Amino acid sequence: MSLGRPWIHDLPGKLHEAALYGYQGIELFFDDLDCLAQTCHNGSHIEAAYHVRELCETLHLSIICLQPFGFYEGLLDRNEHERLVTEKLPRWFHLSRILGTDMIQIPSNFLPADPDTGAARTTGDKDLIVSDLRRVADLGLQQKPSPIRFVYESLAWSNHINTWEECWDVVQRVDRPNFGICLDTYNIAGRVYADPASPTGKTPNADADMHNSLARLRSRTSNTAINISKIFYVQVVDGERLSSPLDENHPFHVPGQPTRMNWSRNARLFPFEQDLGGYLPVLDIAKIIFNDIGFQGWVSLELFSRTLAEPGPLTVREHARRGRVSWNKLVGVLGLRESYPCGYLGGYSLSTWTSGADSTVQHRL
């Protein structure tokens, strides 16, 4: 959750603040579940999952997905691949059922090289990547009483699948009804537009490359045009323009980690926070997703930031407030229509006009 770090800010407190600020749902980060298990349930993830579901039902919060099922596809160590499929995945299926969610998120693999030998531990072989992902999708289809969905997200620093175009190509090749894509404004712009290691904060051809990528995203006529039914949810978030390049002397630098990952972990922002340094073309991307493509569904504000590590309850409340302010601005700028269903928590759904029809989106952390 984007309100505070696990082990610093407890999950029940974050859920209460999310509800108070009118969020309808959450992406459940496994670290939050693990923290709750270790601190309150003698290490039992099962008991923690029941706890989270009961609390979310009381607060009228939906659990949209459990994430991240990471470091999975394209592993060169096929024994580790088998362990993930035969040992870890069944546990995640069980947790998902308890939590009441039907979706597991898989981020594209960014497993670093072997620390001892420097050898790569993943492959860019697209056939193997697709085969690995198709395998979990097929297992998800077999789940009872209903299938489990998987949503694939390209991270800007991943080893091989690091653009939305590559991610969409994989989703098409997997070709399973329960396997879709997550579009994230931060990761879309963070790869082709932003370069935190550059003095300008941008790649050499940032504007042209971003324009071309968005033209492909907007296109509805090409054979590779994105299928709206395959967009399982959307993340809308910005990034901070750093005052100095993120090099080895920068305080955000972590040896062995990709520069964009170090930036992401410390300097994401909610949309419309230009006063805090936001500079990515978030609105341009969002307009295409909501107005041109006509996306309907869950929208997440997935924030990672150094500010989430500040102790105290005010950190959680302030991030909940900032997220809500940001969302309200997005609603206004895109002309979304907000409506409040019954319920003391003030949860809401939002509609925007597209192609003459209502497009409903829902807000979450």
Give the residues covered by each predicted segment.
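Short coil-to-beta-strand
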Residues: 21-24, 56-66, 97-106, 295-299
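Histidine-acidic metal/acid-base catalytic patches
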Residues: 1-22, 86, 145, 161-365
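Conserved beta-strand positions in the central sheet of alpha/beta enzyme cores
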Residues: 27, 65, 105, 151, ...
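Active-site acidic/histidine proton-transfer and metal-coordination neighborhood
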Residues: 13, 55-58, 73-183, 190, ...
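Catalytic-core regions built around general acid/base machinery
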Residues: 41-59, 129-142, 213-225, 280, ...
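Feature marks short, surface-exposed loop/turn motifs that line or immediately flank catalytic pockets
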Residues: 32-34, 69-72, 110-112, 158, ...
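Glycine-rich, proline-tolerant flexible connector loops at the mouths of alpha/beta enzymes
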Residues: 27-56, 108-117
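Short, conserved active-site loops that position catalytic residues or coordinate cofactors/metal ions
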Residues: 23-34, 64-70
